[in-house]
Amino acid sequence: MKKIALIIGSMIAGGIISAAGFTWVAKAEPPAEKTSTAERKILFWYDPMYPNTRFDKPGKSPFMDMDLVPKYADEESSASGVRIDPTQTQNLGVKTATVTRGPLTFAQSFPANVSYNEYQYAIVQARAAGFIDKVYPLTVGDKVQKGTPLLDLTIPDWVEAQSEYLLLRETGGTATQTEGILERLRLAGMPEADIRRLIATQKIQTRFTLKAPIDGVITAFDLRAGMNIAKDNVVAKIQGMDPVWVTAAIPESIAWLVKDASQFTLTVPARPDKTLTIRKWTLLPGVDAATRTLQLRLEVDNADEALKPGMNAWLQLNTASEPMLLIPSQALIDTGSEQRVITVDADGRFVPKRVAVFQASQGVTALRSGLAEGEKVVSSGLFLIDSEANISGALERMRSESATHAH
């Protein structure tokens, strides 16, 4: 019994000593800071690809094969933007760019087409009824020089007018009367060379030759010997080949940049070795309703006739705008109804801002308004930040501010 009592007493004494030691240790250990031991409060979980859908616990996204991301209470945005865990932004490769001011450069190629110069276009008519005596061996597509004979014909009205002229000369008609007859012949279409021959020889001519009035290519010629011809019949159509026209359709949005022929570089795949000289250019006023383009017409030297109507060509436009605000095009978020960027403020917060886009070219976008020179915009890794801005309500605040400024 004494041994049992001794054992029990020893156990009780040991427990008291242990309890006392624990109490002393607990009192001696300094309290840890609450901020280091307290866990960050999670508001909800979400899939960055579908930020408007929230979940009450972690796991795999039902939409994508990726883990849900926590939304922490201390990430709630202030009125000026949102904060994001630096680890997340680093993992996503978030990059920024500075808003600059400078000219927006354009270097774009447009398909073009070679065509006849409509200013060098001649229609040959007899302008009086008659019949064809001879047609010279020509057809559509043949090249002719100015003065090349096309056909011989007899015009009874011209023969009659010549008879009147000679009769007045023989009977002492006045100069006014004879000149009136000659003018009538001119108006009726009698060639000037034949009128001079009449005056010189004082003999009636019964056969007349119609000749090409310009150098060019015959584009219409369908007459045969023995045919009757009315005064309004077209004998031939001839179109010049030097210069030719080269036309290209350019978007109406960049038409304002076209100022000078030095901006153009013209090439023809069929003649890559040929240097083309642009005499002048014209931007036609009409806009194609279907394509929203304007026709740019170039007048190009073609003395050697190497350029043929119907050939394909390429027009390179090299130009630059006046200085304006520029950002990388990849920094722009365009939803169709809204264009915005994500800026970075001095405190490192991401702030969405609505912008007005003017034009874009070669990966650079020019802005009308919305930013200032020197601001920082996110140019890579936009998706996560834009999702956070949507979740936190920063986008709604941006829209509200835009609506307030609009009023």
Curated annotation (Swiss-Prot):
Residues of the signal peptide: 1-28
Note: The cus system plays an important role in copper tolerance under anaerobic growth and, under extreme copper stress, in aerobic growth.
Name of protein: Cation efflux system protein CusB
Any GO molecular function: transition metal ion binding
Keyword Disulfide bond assigned: no
Family: Belongs to the membrane fusion protein (MFP) (TC 8.A.1) family.
Pfam families hit by this protein: CusB_dom_1, HlyD_D23, HMBD
Organism: Escherichia coli (strain K12)
Subunit (UniProt): The cus efflux system is composed of CusA, CusB, CusC and CusF.
Gene Ontology biological process terms in this record: copper ion export; copper ion transmembrane transport; detoxification of copper ion; intracellular copper ion homeostasis; plasma membrane copper ion transport; response to copper ion; response to silver ion; response to toxic substance
Function: Part of a cation efflux system that mediates resistance to copper and silver.
Induction or repression: Transcriptionally regulated by CusR in response to copper and silver ions.
InterPro entries according to UniProt: CusB-like_dom_1, CusB_D23, HMBD, MFP_Cation_Efflux, RND_pump_MFP
The UniProt record lists the keyword 4Fe-4S: no
